[in-house]
Amino acid sequence: MKIRVENSTWNNVGDGWYQTSLYGLLRKTFPQHQVLLGEGPVRRAFRISNGKQLKNALNVMDYERADIHVFSGPMIPSIIRDYSQAIKRLIADGENYVLLSASGTGLSASEIAEIGEFLTKYPPLLLSTRDEETYDNFKSYVSNSYNGICTAFLVDRTIELDTFQLEKPFFISSFYMEMEPTFSLRGGEVRIDNVDVEHHKTMFGLPFRYSRHQNFLRKHQYQLGGHLIVRTVQNLNTRFNHINFAAPNSFISFNPVRYLEVAKSSEFTISDRVHACAISLACNHPARFLFNTHVLAYSTD
């Protein structure tokens, strides 16, 4: 049997963590079968809104063949727009698909009904959600539904990870919705429950999307109490290196697994990025999740 796992729809490297983890999970679970990496919708991956550009794009996903196609992530709200053509084709050809580590939150009743009707007409073999809201929204439309977790919480079980040491112990700071806070110790050892966080207004009072371009002008902490502060940058790009490397010990890579090894080698994570916290927990390190981002389901087992 051929299983093809979507692994291209990254809006940031955090998407690569749960998709690569899912690939590793299926390879370990089904060693007797052929588990391959596959493409997702080019529109989702590159957020294409221009009709001409979308027409020019070669959507290889439409030509992939497998017994089972695996789609994942926050794709349920756009499943009709981005996935329907491929799903209709694969079902017509006698193939199947599953939705694993999938999410569809913040939807209106009419949107849930429309998507639910599509899932009823073109049913997946399995729907395993990564949050309870999605499960509650669609469990009545897909008979084989499971209130699951995000596979980012499984990275240390599904992917072989190495560790390394810097010249000093370190913790991770990763922020993308606001300026990085200032960290201070209440006294004693550098532990996550012993770190105070002081938030800052954006530069010149500008919205963060603009003020981040002036972030390199700010003073940044190099360390705290003998622990280095490592900044993991999840938005992969080569255009804005003044953002990527605005602070000491900034880490960015096109290798998603290396981020996981940075997390495994750290002592803890403080972040407003849910996946940054997820992989820290997956590697048995504490994490402090700040601010109002939708919380993924997770396991403490």
Residue ranges and their predicted role:
Residues 1-301:
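Active-site anion-handling motifs in enzyme catalytic cores
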